[in-house]
Amino acid sequence: MNENSRLHTHSNIRNTFFSEIGIGISGNSFLLLFHIIKFFRGHRPRLTDLPIGLLSLIHLLMLLVAAVIATDIFISWRGWNDIICKFLVYLYRSLRGLSLCTTSMLSVLQAIILSPRSYCLAKFKRKSSHNISCAIIFLSVLYMSISSHLLISITATPNLTMNDFLYVSQSCSLLPLSYLMQSIYSTLLVLREVFLIGLMVLSTSYMVALLYMHRKQAQNLQGTSLSLKASAEQRATQTILMLMTFFVLMSIFDSIVSCSRTMFLDDPTSYSIHIFVMHIYATVSPFVFISTEKHIVNILRG
């Protein structure tokens, strides 16, 4: 029997994981509810409200699906068939892809918002909400098509033990792919990661440069209105910068743990670390956004 199937005996790992999932679901639910109430009350929406609300919804759904899959990892039973396995795993991977796409587009959108009127990026401010929505849809469809191989390779775990199967949960396993298919899939996945994370790095570098210029200009002119404007822009941008940095670090850590898991297929420790690391960003990000919302902070302080 694969050693990963014994994870249900590790109570500390189980409790830690479900605590992480519970905190993440609570945070994303609160953030999503805040944006829904804000919309129905007629508050003027900011350009970043749509992607932030969408990101909280994606993370909420992803964590809920992860909680369902986790019951098949940490609770000793095997009751899922091929259809349930394919649906849950494909849905989960698609939501992870949506999270990456939306995070990347949020970084680009903040860079557009921060751009002065004289810059070429400022031309996209009026249509940025529409353009970002179209970009997210396009990238999401593209990623879901890349992950479509899971509809074939994910299967219910056979009764006979086979070392070639990669453990997903007690009921579900990943069929080994041919060298050609694995190479194609890995190449497409790497291209997607490089492209989207590259957008984050470029937009982040652009925002850092603009913030530095704003600060220098404010110091030279000693203007109150400019200082206040720069301060407001700094708060919004620093939140995005912090999330982008955190996301990139977690992506790198995730890749390292994933590679170590591939090298040591029967190591339950690497698998437990992997499933914990995969959800850190989705758990932490809503609280970062909540901490920057003045209305929420004032209510909590009051």
UniProtKB/Swiss-Prot annotation:
<dbReference type="GO" id="GO:0005886">
    <property type="term" value="C:plasma membrane"/>
</dbReference>
<keyword id="KW-0812">Transmembrane</keyword>
<feature type="transmembrane region" description="Helical; Name=1">
    <location>
        <begin position="17"/>
        <end position="37"/>
    </location>
</feature>
<comment type="function">
    <text>Putative pheromone receptor implicated in the regulation of social and reproductive behavior.</text>
</comment>
<keyword id="KW-1015">Disulfide bond</keyword>
<protein>
    <recommendedName>
        <fullName>Vomeronasal type-1 receptor 48</fullName>
    </recommendedName>
</protein>
<keyword id="KW-0297">G-protein coupled receptor</keyword>
<dbReference type="GO" id="GO:0007606">
    <property type="term" value="P:sensory perception of chemical stimulus"/>
</dbReference>
<feature type="transmembrane region" description="Helical; Name=5">
    <location>
        <begin position="194"/>
        <end position="214"/>
    </location>
</feature>
<feature type="transmembrane region" description="Helical; Name=2">
    <location>
        <begin position="50"/>
        <end position="70"/>
    </location>
</feature>
<dbReference type="InterPro" id="IPR004072">
    <property type="entry name" value="Vmron_rcpt_1"/>
</dbReference>
<keyword id="KW-1133">Transmembrane helix</keyword>
<feature type="glycosylation site" description="N-linked (GlcNAc...) asparagine">
    <location>
        <position position="159"/>
    </location>
</feature>
<dbReference type="InterPro" id="IPR017452">
    <property type="entry name" value="GPCR_Rhodpsn_7TM"/>
</dbReference>
<feature type="topological domain" description="Extracellular">
    <location>
        <begin position="1"/>
        <end position="16"/>
    </location>
</feature>
<feature type="topological domain" description="Extracellular">
    <location>
        <begin position="71"/>
        <end position="91"/>
    </location>
</feature>
<keyword id="KW-0675">Receptor</keyword>
<feature type="disulfide bond">
    <location>
        <begin position="85"/>
        <end position="172"/>
    </location>
</feature>
<feature type="transmembrane region" description="Helical; Name=7">
    <location>
        <begin position="270"/>
        <end position="290"/>
    </location>
</feature>
<feature type="topological domain" description="Extracellular">
    <location>
        <begin position="153"/>
        <end position="193"/>
    </location>
</feature>
<keyword id="KW-0325">Glycoprotein</keyword>
<feature type="topological domain" description="Cytoplasmic">
    <location>
        <begin position="38"/>
        <end position="49"/>
    </location>
</feature>
<feature type="topological domain" description="Extracellular">
    <location>
        <begin position="260"/>
        <end position="269"/>
    </location>
</feature>
<dbReference type="GO" id="GO:0019236">
    <property type="term" value="P:response to pheromone"/>
</dbReference>
<keyword id="KW-0807">Transducer</keyword>
<feature type="transmembrane region" description="Helical; Name=3">
    <location>
        <begin position="92"/>
        <end position="114"/>
    </location>
</feature>
<feature type="topological domain" description="Cytoplasmic">
    <location>
        <begin position="215"/>
        <end position="238"/>
    </location>
</feature>
<feature type="transmembrane region" description="Helical; Name=4">
    <location>
        <begin position="132"/>
        <end position="152"/>
    </location>
</feature>
<feature type="topological domain" description="Cytoplasmic">
    <location>
        <begin position="115"/>
        <end position="131"/>
    </location>
</feature>
<keyword id="KW-1003">Cell membrane</keyword>
<dbReference type="Pfam" id="PF03402">
    <property type="entry name" value="V1R"/>
</dbReference>
<keyword id="KW-0472">Membrane</keyword>
<feature type="topological domain" description="Cytoplasmic">
    <location>
        <begin position="291"/>
        <end position="302"/>
    </location>
</feature>
<dbReference type="GO" id="GO:0016503">
    <property type="term" value="F:pheromone receptor activity"/>
</dbReference>
<feature type="transmembrane region" description="Helical; Name=6">
    <location>
        <begin position="239"/>
        <end position="259"/>
    </location>
</feature>
<keyword id="KW-0589">Pheromone response</keyword>
<comment type="similarity">
    <text>Belongs to the G-protein coupled receptor 1 family.</text>
</comment>
